[in-house]
């Protein structure tokens, strides 16, 4: 689960790092920072063991697209889906640092009891005085295991171990009582009361 959250945050961070440069190039090309710009998204290979759904919210374009990267995934994961929706870009803020924050919430009542929703929000500022805010939320659905299965080797091993310990205890008790036991002496004729 933590691996999926890290993968989602890493993919979101890669997109955040690519967005300011792309927005700055579009702004300088068209001359207006308030116009509608199309921002290309990064595609990356994701190696996770659970289903991950990421949503990137953006108000810059009204077009919603789905990117399914072709990647090497384990057999129990089908794909990672990235849906960009809105990105807020404003020019007044200038800051040379990145502020990441992550929060983890419990699943809603409509979700399955094993699903976990993780959301992260990251704000960064590029050198061109553009403020970019991207919100990434990931939902993981762990696959069900095969459950417990009878292991004959462990069963036989447990029986052998138990019998071995019992036999050692039995032999130890026999030796202890044989050394400590009552010593009988033979009755001689002169000691016998007749």
Curated annotation (Swiss-Prot):
Residues 1-24 form the signal peptide. Residues 173-194 are cytoplasmic. The keyword Amino-acid biosynthesis does not apply. It is a single-pass type I membrane protein. Coiled coil: none annotated. The chain crosses the membrane at residues 152-172. This is Porimin. The lineage of its organism: Eukaryota, Metazoa, Chordata, Craniata, Vertebrata. The gene is Tmem123.
